[in-house]
Amino acid sequence: MSSGKKAVKVKTPAGKEAELVPEKVWALAPKGRKGVKIGLFKDPETGKYFRHKLPDDYPI
């Protein structure tokens, strides 16, 4: 896991709460607007990837 990223509490597609570190983080914003930050996570149980919104203060 990358050391620069911090774990975020997310809900996995299986419906469980887990503290995971996103594999990739990006901003999703229309031109000239604030937008949101999205993270790509991997479900530790199923191995499937899913996206989840991140807090606004999360470093990219």
From Swiss-Prot:
Gene3D superfamilies in UniProt: Chromatin protein Cren7
Residue stretches in coiled coil: none
Post-translational modification: Methylated at multiple sites, to varying extents. At least one methylation occurs on Lys-16.
Modified residues (N6-methyllysine): 16
Keywords: Chromosome, Cytoplasm, DNA-binding, Methylation
Listed GO CC annotations: chromosome; cytoplasm
Gene Ontology molecular function, alphabetical: double-stranded DNA binding
Keyword match DNA-binding: yes
Classification via InterPro entries: Cren7_sf, dsDNA-bd_Cren7
Subcellular location: Chromosome; Cytoplasm
Matches recorded under HAMAP family: Chromatin_Cren7
Subunit and partners: Monomer.
Primary role: A chromatin protein, binds double-stranded DNA without sequence specificity. Constrains negative DNA supercoils.
Family assignment from sequence similarity: Belongs to the Cren7 family.
Full protein name: Chromatin protein Cren7
Gene that this polypeptide is encoded by: cren7
